[in-house]
Amino acid sequence: MTGKIFLDGGAGYIGSMLIGYLLDEGYKVTCFDNLLYDKTSLLAYCSHKNFNFIKGDVRNFELLKKEISKHDIIIPFSALVGAPLCEKNPLDAKLVNFEHVKYLAKNKSKDQLLLYNNSNSGLGETDGKSLATEETEFNPISLYGKTKYFGELAVRESENHLVFRLATIFGGSPRPRNDLLVNNLVLRALKDRVLIVYEGHYIRNYLHIRDVCKAFVFALDNWDKCKNEVYNLGNDNLNMSKLDLCKKINEYIPVEIIEAQYTKDLDKRNYKISSQKFYNKGFQCEYSLDDGIKELMQVYKMIDVPQYANY
């Protein structure tokens, strides 16, 4: 498949990586972003003949409507990501995470493709033993989890859609994020040689950012057999506790690991995820946790650490 893609929030952590994959596949990509966090993450694409940038805010619905009408595929990435940031900015969380997505879903044509990313954060707290599938009841706790889930529900009411529920993402990007769990723990290990972990028994599922990008391309290339469904998107080999994650990092960076209940996860994320439904379509993950740790060890030799976080 080729076509014109409208990707909002494309200057962010995943979007700035995904754009390169889409351009390599021959898509024409318009990135719509207000550049809240980073004004340089897209510079490498500016010379590409199929790349276009529009500086704009997704809360400007009239501008959104005008721009999406020119495209075949809509991929909304603009979001206030993470429970802490949404708690600080509840109105913007509702407008950006939910209302703008609902507007896109209602105002696109039936022939336009809409590819949405939700988060598995909405699962809330499970027993951490049984595998959560797409049929497992969603129970979002935080404002972040709720707004992302409401966005998913709006998308599912439209024709020609696909929803991914993303695992915890890790790895380097043109717009790095140091507040993601794996990235942050590698950074802390390198800087402090100590990892202080709370709720260490809590289990999460992880996925390398490049596998996220590959999954989006795969979905577009195989749209007819994938469309109008919800898919967990994670690495089934990476269901692991936070404490085991620290131990894996310790294999590469010698650290002292300390368990301390100094805070709590607002989303109470404790779950094992199965992404078998999407694997059954033919997708395979390529990047391991070891790959990501070694990559991040190189990344953190280069970047200005305090600059790259969402909250």
For each of these PLM feature ranges, what is it?
Residues 58-95:
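NAD(P)H-binding glycine-rich loop region in Rossmannoid oxidoreductase-like domains
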Residues 76, 102-141:
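Conserved Rossmann-fold NAD(P)-dependent oxidoreductase catalytic core, especially the SDR/UDP-sugar
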Residues 1-73:
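N-terminal Rossmann/SDR dinucleotide-binding element
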Residues 123-124, 139-143, 164-180:
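Flexible, glycine-rich beta-alpha linker
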Residues 83-100, 132-140:
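Short alpha-helical oligomerization interface
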Residues 139-162, 190:
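Active-site Tyr-X1-5-Lys
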Residues 119, 152-173:
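Conserved beta-loop-beta element that borders a ligand/cofactor-binding pocket
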Residues 192-193, 197-311:
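C-terminal substrate-binding subdomain of Rossmann-fold SDR/epimerase-dehydratase oxidoreductases
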